[in-house]
Swiss-Prot record:
<dbReference type="InterPro" id="IPR042121">
    <property type="entry name" value="MutL_C_regsub"/>
</dbReference>
<dbReference type="GO" id="GO:0140664">
    <property type="term" value="F:ATP-dependent DNA damage sensor activity"/>
</dbReference>
<comment type="similarity">
    <text>Belongs to the DNA mismatch repair MutL/HexB family.</text>
</comment>
<keyword id="KW-0227">DNA damage</keyword>
<dbReference type="Pfam" id="PF08676">
    <property type="entry name" value="MutL_C"/>
</dbReference>
<dbReference type="InterPro" id="IPR042120">
    <property type="entry name" value="MutL_C_dimsub"/>
</dbReference>
<keyword id="KW-0234">DNA repair</keyword>
<dbReference type="GO" id="GO:0006298">
    <property type="term" value="P:mismatch repair"/>
</dbReference>
<dbReference type="InterPro" id="IPR002099">
    <property type="entry name" value="MutL/Mlh/PMS"/>
</dbReference>
<dbReference type="GO" id="GO:0005524">
    <property type="term" value="F:ATP binding"/>
</dbReference>
<dbReference type="InterPro" id="IPR036890">
    <property type="entry name" value="HATPase_C_sf"/>
</dbReference>
<dbReference type="Pfam" id="PF13589">
    <property type="entry name" value="HATPase_c_3"/>
</dbReference>
<dbReference type="GO" id="GO:0032300">
    <property type="term" value="C:mismatch repair complex"/>
</dbReference>
<dbReference type="InterPro" id="IPR014790">
    <property type="entry name" value="MutL_C"/>
</dbReference>
<dbReference type="InterPro" id="IPR037198">
    <property type="entry name" value="MutL_C_sf"/>
</dbReference>
<dbReference type="InterPro" id="IPR014762">
    <property type="entry name" value="DNA_mismatch_repair_CS"/>
</dbReference>
<dbReference type="InterPro" id="IPR013507">
    <property type="entry name" value="DNA_mismatch_S5_2-like"/>
</dbReference>
Length: 617
């Protein structure tokens, strides 16, 4: 069979198969054209999930009749000259319009601002019509009907109208975040409308429009630079997380991308701070010299290739971690919001259904719950006791031992602590009570804080262990009688393969015959610990990450497990000075707003919110 030149229509249909995968792909290409044209207002109308109709209206620079005729021809563009190494526009290939026109019914009407008349051209299944005069305002209107009518096999691979419409909405949100100075309006056939007014230079306001106002309250600003790469944007606190990665947005020179390198860097930055199966919320904006990034590696331009990927990844991981550390013990406000919603009075004047259920069960012990136990954790023996030179800060706090139903009257708080609370020096306030032998209630300058004592202390122990990891071996305590633990042979082998790493953490183990491990030393900072439970859990977790991760990451993972076993447990009564020592240590420790599993360690309620619940504001 002889080789022959393909027809222009077939060439465009092949290109459409790469560039236009679904209605959202077509909408993205057309919106990029509108942005490149300098539009400040873009309206998107859809019907049938974008399959029946896509109409993009903008107030950009527009085109005259000559440009319009060239725009529907393949590889005709005003955005590229001779080099692919200096691309500053979103589009540059000149493929979108001819590709769409080859598989749909395409109509374009456009008018330049300095022209008295508009022009129109139609393309149907690759057949290009003539340019004709037409009425119209300055700007461009692109209308796509019956997408893929010329390639009906493609229609079988599209999802439902609802799913395709959702994909268009998500794409518009990504574009809107990247360009806050542009007003976006999206309307569907079901009369639903997404309207995003322009926010100018206030990127966080635009992000809040898309992700909701909660993100504004839980966002940390990013501003870091390394060599020729700048990172801006916002990262959510670890406890503000979601069930999937759909709320992770990345932009390179204003271009929305879903790049694996960037998404991997986000995961690495939040390692050990977000629960398994949960995903942090982040909006990252990278500004790179165009010569240092290749945007022409994917047909849909959703991936990029950096000249120095290691530099970019290191910048992202380092900037996010430093920002999280700088925020210290900050935790998500979502927990407080959920609590307020639960206790908001219902229509009948009582509590809402969730609050009523909680009230009905407030004095009923949970199934299988242990009764309160005397504390085996003491401020005097804990590695997290106050420093000697700071002990005076807690003078006067030797109140009666807190019980599960204990409370502290205002007169019982010492004058130094009261003054510190008024000045705001103690951000987490002073302990008022311990309820259900699990939660510490503290009064702050402008509200109250509820602390999960186990989760908080677990984080403190972990941070101390992680800090010690960067230096010498962690201090250990020898066991008077070695603990012999029976394990499956494969678990014994795994533990012994990592015996050196465990020894750095203060856990000294050795073989004790077939199917057994002898533990001779445990980390000193853990105090009394369930050694068999700790070793068995370590064996299980080592089996999961045995072939992945760096040494330090593995050691951190082990440290997190050890911290959980060595922390003050739920159900233990604490003295008031112990509670306050825990609060002070939390204030000093970066990342103490969430435990090692990513759950919040405390919830803060502002006085204004509490007063609203009682109708006092």
């Amino acid at each position: 069979m002889s080789i022959k030149q393909l027809s222009e229509t077939l060439i465009n249909q092949i290109a459409a198969g790469e560039v236009i995968e679904r209605p959202a792909s077509a909408a993205k290409e057309l919106i990029e054209n509108a942005i490149d044209a300098g539009a400040s207002r873009i309206e998107i109308a859809t019907a049938g999930g974008g399959k029946a109709l896509l109409r993009i209206t903008d107030n950009g620079c527009g085109m005259d009749g000559q440009d319009l005729a060239l725009a529907v021809r393949r590889h005709c563009t005003s955005k590229l000259n001779e080099s692919l190494m200096d691309i500053k526009s979103l589009g540059f290939r000149g493929e979108a319009l001819p590709s769409i026109g080859s598989v749909a019914r395409l109509t374009i009407a456009s008018r330049r601002a300095d022209s008295a008349s508009a022009f129109q051209i139609a393309v149907e299944g690759g057949k290009v019509g003539e340019v004709r005069p037409a009425p119209g305002n300055p700007g461009t209107v692109v209308e796509v009907r019956d997408l893929f009518f010329a390639t009906p096999a493609r229609l079988k691979f599209l999802k439902t109208e609802r799913a395709e419409a959702a994909a268009i909405t998500e794409m518009v949100k990504r574009m809107a975040i990247a360009f806050p100075k542009i007003r976006f309006v999206l309307s569907g056939s079901d009369r639903s409308t997404l309207e995003l007014p322009a926010t100018g230079d206030d990127h966080l306001a635009r992000i809040a429009q898309v992700l909701g106002p909660d993100f504004r309250d839980n966002a940390i600003a990013l501003d870091a630079e390394r060599e020729d790469v700048h990172l801006g944007g916002f990262a959510g606190v670890p406890t503000f997380n979601r069930g999937n990665s759909a709320h992770q947005y990345a932009f390179v020179n204003g271009r929305p991308v879903q790049d694996k390198l960037i998404l991997s860097a986000i995961r690495g930055a939040y390692a050990e701070t977000v629960p398994h199966g949960r995903y942090p919320v982040a909006v990252l904006a990278l500004t790179v010299d165009p010569a240092l990034v290749d945007v022409n590696v994917h047909p849909a331009k959703s991936d990029v290739r950096f000249r120095d990927p290691g530099l970019v990844r290191g910048l992202i991981v380092g900037a996010i971690r430093q920002s999280l550390t700088r925020e210290g013990d900050r935790s998500s406000t979502a927990g407080a919001g959920a609590m307020l919603r639960a206790f908001r009075p219902g229509a009948n004047g009582g509590f809402s259904e969730g609050a009523q259920a909680a009230a009905n069960n407030s004095y009923a012990p949970a199934y299988g719950a242990r009764p309160p136990q005397p504390s085996a954790w003491s401020v005097d023996t804990s590695p997290h006791r106050p420093l000697d030179d700071g002990q005076n800060r807690f003078d006067g706090l030797a109140l009666p031992a807190a019980r599960a139903d204990a409370h502290v009257s205002p007169s019982q708080i010492s004058e130094p602590v009261a003054m510190a609370m008024e000045s705001g020096r103690f951000r987490l306030g002073a302990a008022r009570a311990q309820v259900h032998a699990n939660y510490i209630v503290a009064q702050t300058q402008d509200g109250l804080v509820i602390v999960d004592q186990h989760a908080a202390h677990e984080r403190l122990v972990f941070e101390d262990m992680r800090k010690a990891l960067s230096g010498r071996r962690l201090p250990s305590q020898g066991l008077l009688i070695p603990e012999i633990i029976g394990l499956p042979e494969e678990d014994c082998d795994r533990l012994m393969d990592h015996a050196e790493n465990l020894d750095r953490l203060g856990l000294a183990i050795e073989r004790f015959g077939p199917g057994a491990i002898a533990v001779r030393e445990t980390p000193a900072m853990l105090g009394e610990v369930d050694v068999p439970g700790l070793v068995r859990q370590l064996a299980d977790e080592i089996a999961e990450w045995e072939t992945a991760g760096s040494l330090f990451a593995r050691l951190e993972h082990v440290a997190a497990t050890m911290a959980c076993h060595g922390s003050v447990r739920s159900g233990r009564l604490l003295r008031v000075e112990e509670m306050n020592a825990l609060l002070r240590k939390m204030e000093e420790t970066p990342g103490s707003g969430q435990c090692n599993h990513g759950r919040p360690t405390y919830i803060e309620l502002k006085l204004s919110d509490i007063e609203r619940l009682f109708g006092r504001s």
